[in-house]
Amino acid sequence: MAGILFEDIFDVKDIDPEGKKFDRVSRLHCESESFKMDLILDVNIQIYPVDLGDKFRLVIASTLYEDGTLDDGEYNPTDDRPSRADQFEYVMYGKVYRIEGDETSTEAATRLSAYVSYGGLLMRLQGDANNLHGFEVDSRVYLLMKKLAF
């Protein structure tokens, strides 16, 4: 689908392992089912409570429009086009601020880590470089989440 940079199902393996730092935010440590990616994600648990063992679908996209049309980064309440956000429970908009690899001087990176800030809520998605090829520093991305019943 146009505009989707990454999509997978994640299992919540740990919550706030270093201790709770903020009242309304928890840091989730998750692992994906298909691509074995590691995810660390800050979530506003007052809006979207998450429990240990929960499974959720995560999509990282460059646009909310199904046809891949880029938006201008501003909310337009009169826009009535269908949106990817309609199918999800929790959506954030942020900026990729760092990409790190395990490259050496002789080999290209096989594992990458993409870091995104969603207004101060942070995400690190780490895994095979092939799964993170669409991420670019300073690009704007949407994170979309929906819990799965299992």
Curated annotation (Swiss-Prot):
Domain of life of the source: Eukaryota
Cell location: Nucleus; Nucleus, Nucleolus
Record's keyword annotation contains Transcription: yes
Record keywords: Acetylation, DNA-binding, DNA-directed RNA polymerase, Nucleus, Transcription
One GO molecular-function entry: DNA-directed RNA polymerase activity
UniProt modified residues of type N-acetylalanine: 2
SUPFAM superfamilies: Nucleic acid-binding proteins
Major location (coarse): nucleus
The keyword rRNA-binding appears for this protein: no
GO biological process, one term: transcription by RNA polymerase II
Role summary: DNA-dependent RNA polymerase catalyzes the transcription of DNA into RNA using the four ribonucleoside triphosphates as substrates. Common component of RNA polymerases I, II and III which synthesize ribosomal RNA precursors, mRNA precursors and many functional non-coding RNAs, and small RNAs, such as 5S rRNA and tRNAs, respectively.
Family as reported in the entry's similarity comment: Belongs to the eukaryotic RPB8 RNA polymerase subunit family.
Annotated protein name in UniProt: DNA-directed RNA polymerases I, II, and III subunit RPABC3
Source organism of the structure: Homo sapiens (Human)
